Amino acid sequence: MSSYFVNSTFPVTLASGQESFLGQLPLYSSGYADPLRHYPAPYGPGPGQDKGFATSSYYPPAGGGYGRAAPCDYGPAPAFYREKESACALSGADEQPPFHPEPRKSDCAQDKSVFGETEEQKCSTPVYPWMQRMNSCNSSSFGPSGRRGRQTYTRYQTLELEKEFHYNRYLTRRRRIEIAHALCLTERQIKIWFQNRRMKWKKESKLLSASQLSAEEEEEKQAE
């Protein structure tokens, strides 16, 4: 038989005077005490004393130098704070101003006028050939497919170019730059316009000479 059931340190038969001593010791040598037996606690009265109320599991600190701590209040605090939060949320929703996602156009125009140039000021500023590649007064010369579109000239620009071509069919670089600045065109546009105009003039002169020759030949035939 194992020692778990019978303690080998004490004999089975003891004297009548030692039975009281046996009752104070545990019957198991494995180190586990009887769960039904109660021993006196080192602090305070034992649980065996008669009390009119149940003991609490909360113990104040033993070595507190600032006196005994006040008992904690475990009242229905969550319900109180929940009601308070709901009341605050309702009051905050009433005081919240309406939200405007899109600003007004007048405000945007005012901001542009204060912090930057407006569209009218940008168009009124002079643009020189070395500042911009294409013509700034006209629309973009490139179409949606990326190809260069046909350049259009105003009546004033065409009139001034025709006057210059009437006096000079070939322009110097200095004169070409002056005309480009005066007509708000690029130097390349002036150069291309004069090339096309010379080709047209040559074609017209050829047609005119051909018509003159044909007219002379008819006169000679009639004279014969």
UniProtKB/Swiss-Prot annotation:
Mention one GO biological process in which this protein takes part, according to its record: embryonic skeletal system morphogenesis
Q: Which residues bind DNA?
A: 146-205
Among its keywords, does the record have Nucleotide-binding?
Answer: no
Cellular location(s): Nucleus
**CDD domains cross-referenced by the UniProt entry:** homeodomain
Where is the motif named Antp-type hexapeptide mapped on this chain? 127-132
Query: Mind telling me which GO cellular component terms the entry cites?
Result: chromatin; nucleus
Could you tell me the keywords of this UniProt record? Developmental protein, DNA-binding, Homeobox, Nucleus, Phosphoprotein, Transcription, Transcription regulation
Which GO molecular function terms does the record list? DNA-binding transcription factor activity, RNA polymerase II-specific; RNA binding; RNA polymerase II cis-regulatory region sequence-specific DNA binding; sequence-specific double-stranded DNA binding
Q: Which residues carry this modification: Phosphoserine?
A: S214
- Family named by the database record: Belongs to the Antp homeobox family.
Query: According to its UniProt entry, what is the function of this protein?
Result: Sequence-specific transcription factor which is part of a developmental regulatory system that provides cells with specific positional identities on the anterior-posterior axis.
Q: Please state what the protein is called.
A: Homeobox protein Hox-B6
Provide the species name. Homo sapiens
Highest classification ranks of the organism:
Eukaryota, Metazoa, Chordata, Craniata, Vertebrata
